[in-house]
Amino acid sequence: MIDSKTKLIGLIGHPVEHSFSPIMHNAAIKDLGINYTYLAFDVSEENLKYIVSGAKALQIAGFNVTIPHKINIMKYLDEIDEDAKSIGAVNTVKIENGKTIGYNTDGIGVKRALEEKSGILINKNILIIGSGGASRAVSFELAKENNLTIVNRNIEKAKILSEELSTKLKKENSIKYGALNIDIKNFDIIINTTPVGMYPDTDVNPVIPLNDIKKSAVVMDLIYNPLEPVFLKEAMKYGVETINGLGMLVYQGAVSFQIWTGKKPDVYVMKKAINSKIR
């Protein structure tokens, strides 16, 4: 029940009306019995600069940041976590004692979703499709203990990201780059970090041939609308394990939730809430 002591957390982005974040976070709040509520706010680019001062004035506990504000929000924050600085994007803001602190939980969200299916990720050969904002967070996290190859339509962008990560993580030989027609037979994990295949353009497929994929490989797509994007449907034809973006959404959200509240949410409760909405 909302009262004068209820703490507000939320999501800012544009658009946000189809977001599952309020559903899963409010389910976790109810499950833990804590006095919080989570709302989604559609914020245009021109109004972004007012969000931080407004959130401070209203004593909001914190908020998630989604497309298109993950990079631009950084210039308005008081502090930025070291990993988020290295990634160059923020998806979580905590407000404490009048100070805003930015974090990025996207990479750890993907890692935990993968480990749920594949076990501990160490020394795996991972192929990352895309070199945009999502790719930066995922690549930064997974490159810490694995071997990465980043591919992109624009090979120069893949090269720039791989070199940047190699420098930041001091891993010169384990982060490579290549073209979309790369030989995939030696990869343990393949991850699409691009929006290719996302609603409403659900018939479009990242141009990665999977015919040489090994049977033990895992294919992940960060898209969760639709739940079975065309890239995963293609992977299923080869009998490999597939993971959609729902797990990443839940796990990155769970880390954000703990940053704001100090409480560890039940990810099963969060997943169940989303699944009941989808079905």
Curated annotation (Swiss-Prot):
One GO process term, biological-process aspect: chorismate biosynthetic process
Keyword entries, A-Z: Amino-acid biosynthesis, Aromatic amino acid biosynthesis, NADP, Oxidoreductase
GO-annotated molecular function: NADP binding; shikimate 3-dehydrogenase (NADP+) activity
Reactions catalysed: shikimate + NADP(+) = 3-dehydroshikimate + NADPH + H(+)
Active site: 70 (proton acceptor)
Involved pathway(s): Metabolic intermediate biosynthesis; chorismate biosynthesis; chorismate from D-erythrose 4-phosphate and phosphoenolpyruvate: step 4/7
Pfam families found in the cross-reference section: SDH_C, Shikimate_DH, Shikimate_dh_N
Binding site for shikimate: 19-21, 66, 91, 106, 224
Quaternary structure and partners: Homodimer.
Role this protein plays: Involved in the biosynthesis of the chorismate, which leads to the biosynthesis of aromatic amino acids. Catalyzes the reversible NADPH linked reduction of 3-dehydroshikimate (DHSA) to yield shikimate (SA).
Residues that, per the record, bind NADP(+): 82, 130-134, 222, 245
Entry protein name: Shikimate dehydrogenase (NADP(+))
Enzyme Commission (EC) number: 1.1.1.25
Classification lineage: Archaea, Methanobacteriati, Methanobacteriota, Methanomada group, Methanococci
Matching InterPro entries: Aminoacid_DH-like_N_sf (IPR046346), NAD(P)-bd_dom_sf (IPR036291), SDH_C (IPR041121), Shikimate_DH (IPR011342), Shikimate_DH-bd_N (IPR013708), Shikimate_DH_fam (IPR022893), Shikm_DH/Glu-tRNA_Rdtase (IPR006151)
Family: Belongs to the shikimate dehydrogenase family.
Organism from which the protein derives: Methanococcus maripaludis (strain C6 / ATCC BAA-1332)
Enzyme class per UniProt: oxidoreductase
TM regions (residue ranges): none
Source superkingdom: Archaea
Positions of disulphide bridges: none
